[in-house]
A protein has these predicted regions:
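Short beta-strand scaffold segments in enzyme catalytic cores
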Residues: 14-18, 143-148
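Glycine-rich phosphate-binding loop and adjoining helix at the ATP-binding site
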Residues: 34, 43-47, 63-67, 74-135
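Alpha-helical scaffold within the catalytic cores of cyclic-nucleotide enzymes
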Residues: 46-53, 57
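Short glycine-rich anion-binding loops that position phosphate/pyrophosphate groups of nucleotides
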Residues: 72-75, 140-142
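Short glycine-rich, Thr/Ser-proximal phosphate-binding strand/loop in the N-terminal lobe
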Residues: 3-48, 81-84
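Short, basic/aromatic recognition patches
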Residues: 2-3, 134
Length: 151
């Protein structure tokens, strides 16, 4: 059975989970989001929690079939990076994500979304209710909203 990784990159914390194809949680890891000196430190923290979640799950990172990242913005989706995040120090101008994670996991199936939009997708397609219409709010280090209308 395939294994998957999910990453939550916020201004305060970075978290990762490893799960199997049934959605059974196999491992978790978390760390504080580095405050600098550059975005590479944040990238390394993401890779570290992914390694930690895989280790707790007892799986090799290279056995992961795909990964999803929900991250603070703004995002450069074409390059798979966070660009000049407002909630982090000015010295952090770019946080590369999909490229380094693709190398660690040995897969091109690494997907990046804004964290709030990822929440909307999760609630719409994977919650018990599967609501066609909703507003999803995040209130943390920043404030965000996602809307789903007519599915």
């Amino acid at each position: 059975m395939a294994n998957y990784v999910g990453v939550d990159l916020g201004a305060t914390n970075v978290r990762a989970v490893a799960a199997d194809g049934n959605g059974t949680l196999l491992g978790t890891a978390a760390a504080d989001t580095p405050r600098g000196p550059t975005g590479i430190g944040v990238t390394e923290a993401v890779l570290g929690v992914v390694r930690g979640a895989c280790a707790e799950a007892g799986i090799d990172p290279e056995s992961v079939a795909a990964a999803g990242i929900g991250a603070i913005g703004p995002l450069d989706l074409a390059e798979g990076a966070v660009e000049n995040p407002a909630n982090l120090p000015d010295t952090i101008d770019r946080i590369p994500l999909t490229g380094p994670l693709s190398v660690l996991l040995d897969t091109d199936r690494v997907y990046l979304h804004n964290d709030t939009n990822a929440g909307v997708i999760g609630e719409r397609f994977y919650s018990e209710r599967n609501p066609d219409d909703m507003v999803y709010l995040t209130i943390s280090s920043g404030i965000g909203a996602g809307v789903c209308v007519d599915g």
